[in-house]
């Protein structure tokens, strides 16, 4: 078929050749054309979803609120996925059109090995031994009772809950997979952990290793343990990148026994994933920049997604790290910053599909729940610094427990030793910053840590929200890396120079680690033998007959009921308590009342505490202390039934 165009004959074959030429000019390489086709296809699918769902899938949450109703999880899911599809369609379309601009065209030719460090066999054997030892150190913590936040995750995101019915009975309501993946009513669902914990728990139940509908600590904590042990390997590799094999071994060994790492790598929440992915991010970026292959950039994007998916508070670290990394890559002048930006856009699109339904729930929880408006004080800096350095708080938050770990107590008893520890630790970290600072990627990591802390504190002060010390957990792995690299750097400098300088450097290293090991012994042993809340122990105590008589056991302000759904949950007023007292006397059964959060009860219903503790009708028969705060202590009081009055 022929025709004319601008006075010249044209046929279909010529048009095809022109189109092909234009196509090649836009996407000159096979890789660019392949990327454009894949991304373009995703953009088309997203556009179809947006067009098909417009109107029907939007405004669902607002409509429910306008009707005075609580939005359903399905409303958040549908509306969130629609918005995610809209944004991802735009992102993929832009990336498809600009594929030749951001794609590393000469990736294979430019690929070069990372700064070479000989992979000695002893390093891997030693690292394996450290990982095994780290597992042994953490093993006792797997069987500790769950504490309040862990029970919330179990009830809302992993297994289910026994809901109290109007007649007083309890009905088991299992958690749906939608709730595991997208439920976030209290802004505390670390989704990757919840998915892994649910798989482990369901498998344990199916094999008969755990009882259905009841907590099983080991399966619930196993995903956290595996991620925590994996973080030891990543920390070792990151330290090895700048300090050699010995720095890697030191960093892994210190992380294996650091009380904060030990504790949060064994809690049934998503903390251990932060310990894993925070140090993995700079390691993968370093390799992606050195090699340039798309698989490394994909790994970098995936690491970002996993870190932010596990804990949204990691955003400050990501902003600081990626902002500095962008400046570094832009100054290189080889265009790799364009691939860096593209990886971020892909990560953002994927993250939105994973978290778009959760974000409105999190915003609503932070806005409406008073606990998120606590703010921070100057003591926060002392506490956070103490946790990062020694794994224990600065103040003893639970004065009733004299042996509770507290760096302030050590300071009062041995001020010179603590000061020496602080100075030597600062020297090690400073030497580490100087060593890694000789490399641009090392400077990015070193300076992103204080910048992330500043961003977190500034945002918290500006918004008046909450900033708990463990929110800064992403600082710990890199801090240990800097200290380990600094130790090796000082020793190497001492060996080169000799004389007094050598002895001084060696003294700093030895005193730092010797003093640190001495200080962390107490919190490490405490965390190994003691959980945060003894909820399981409370449930077991309440189930034991008193003088051969089954007690009338009730709970108030304690999550122990998750271990025994048959326990009666006492209401907030005294009417229920008086009724139970009368029932105890009538049936001749001792009444046991278990409660926690004493300070909260004292503030909300002081008459309840007065009736229990001051009336003389009750005696305390058990007390289970908790870690960090008095509210985690569990108290059990017993009322002896009065004999019926004689006529």
Feature-to-residue mapping (PLM):
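N-terminal hydrophobic targeting signals that begin at the initiator methionine
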Residues: 2, 19-20, 241
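Membrane-interfacial, low-structure loops and terminal tails that flank and connect transmembrane helices
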Residues: 11-34, 102-122, 435-440, 495-499
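Short, solvent-exposed mixed-charge patches
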Residues: 643-647
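Membrane-proximal helix-loop-helix interfaces that form the catalytic/acceptor-binding platform
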Residues: 30-107, 131-493, 504-507, 512-639
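Primarily residues marking transmembrane-helix entry/exit sites
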Residues: 123-127, 214
């Amino acid at each position: 078929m022929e025709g004319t165009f601008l006075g010249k004959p044209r046929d279909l074959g010529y048009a095809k050749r022109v189109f092909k030429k234009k196509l090649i000019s836009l996407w000159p390489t096979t890789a660019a054309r392949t990327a454009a086709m894949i991304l373009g296809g995703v953009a088309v699918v997203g556009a179809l979803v947006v067009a098909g769902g417009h109107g029907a899938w939007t405004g669902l949450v607002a409509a429910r609120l306008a009707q005075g109703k609580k939005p359903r999880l399905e409303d958040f899911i549908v509306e969130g996925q629609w918005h995610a599809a809209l944004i991802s369609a735009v992102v993929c379309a832009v990336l498809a059109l600009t594929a030749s601009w951001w794609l590393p065209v000469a990736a294979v030719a430019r690929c070069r090995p990372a700064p070479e460090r000989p992979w000695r066999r002893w390093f891997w054997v030693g690292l394996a031994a450290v990982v095994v030892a780290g597992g042994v150190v953490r093993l006792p913590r797997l069987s500790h009772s769950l504490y309040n936040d862990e029970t919330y995750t179990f009830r809302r995101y992993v297994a289910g809950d026994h809901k109290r019915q109007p007649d007083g009975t309890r009905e088991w309501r299992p958690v749906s997979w939608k709730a595991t993946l997208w439920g976030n009513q209290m802004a505390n669902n670390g989704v990757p952990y919840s998915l892994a914990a649910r798989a482990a728990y369901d498998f344990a139940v199916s094999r008969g290793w755990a009882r259905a509908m009841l907590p099983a600590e080991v399966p619930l904590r196993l995903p956290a343990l595996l991620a925590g042990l994996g973080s030891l390997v990543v920390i070792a590799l990151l330290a090895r990148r700048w300090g050699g094999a010995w720095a890697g071994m030191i960093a892994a060994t210190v992380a294996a026994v650091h009380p904060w790492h030990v504790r949060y790598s064994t809690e049934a929440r998503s903390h251990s994933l932060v310990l894993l992915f925070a140090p993995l991010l700079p390691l993968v970026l370093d390799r992606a920049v050195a090699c340039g292959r798309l698989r490394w950039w994909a790994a970098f994007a995936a690491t970002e997604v996993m870190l932010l998916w596990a804990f949204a508070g990691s955003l400050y670290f990501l902003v600081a790290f990626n902002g500095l990394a962008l400046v570094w890559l832009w100054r290189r002048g080889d265009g790799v910053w364009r691939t860096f930006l593209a990886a971020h856009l892909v990560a953002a699109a994927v993250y939105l599909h994973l978290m778009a339904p959760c974000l409105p729930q999190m915003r609503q929880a932070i806005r409406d729940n008073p606990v998120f408006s606590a703010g921070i004080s100057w003591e926060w800096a002392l506490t956070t610094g103490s946790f990062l350095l020694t794994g224990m708080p600065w103040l003893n938050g639970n004065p009733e427990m004299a042996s509770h770990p507290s760096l302030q107590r050590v300071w009062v008893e041995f001020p010179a030793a603590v000061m020496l520890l602080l100075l030597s630790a600062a020297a090690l970290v400073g030497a580490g910053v100087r060593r890694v600072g000789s490399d641009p990627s090392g400077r990015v990591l070193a300076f992103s840590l204080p910048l992330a802390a500043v961003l977190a504190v500034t945002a918290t002060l500006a918004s008046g929200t909450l900033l708990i010390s463990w929110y800064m957990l992403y600082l710990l792995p890199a801090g240990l890396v800097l200290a380990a690299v600094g130790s090796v750097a000082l020793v190497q400098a001492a060996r080169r120079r000799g004389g007094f300088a050598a002895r001084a450097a060696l003294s700093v290293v030895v005193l730092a680690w010797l003093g640190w090991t001495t200080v962390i012994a107490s919190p490490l042993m405490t965390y190994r033998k003691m959980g945060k809340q003894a909820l399981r122990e409370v449930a077991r105590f309440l189930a034991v007959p008193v003088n051969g008589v089954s007690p009338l056991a009730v709970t108030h302000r304690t999550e122990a009921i998750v271990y025994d759904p048959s326990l009666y949950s006492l209401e907030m007023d005294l009417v229920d308590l008086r009724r139970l007292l009368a029932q105890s006397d009538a049936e001749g059964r001792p009444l046991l009342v278990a409660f926690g959060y004493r300070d909260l009860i004292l503030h909300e219903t002081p008459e309840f505490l007065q009736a229990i503790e001051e009336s003389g009708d009750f005696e305390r028969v058990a007390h289970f202390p908790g870690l960090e705060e008095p509210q985690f202590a569990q108290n059990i009081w017993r009322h002896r039934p009065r004999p019926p009055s004689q006529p």
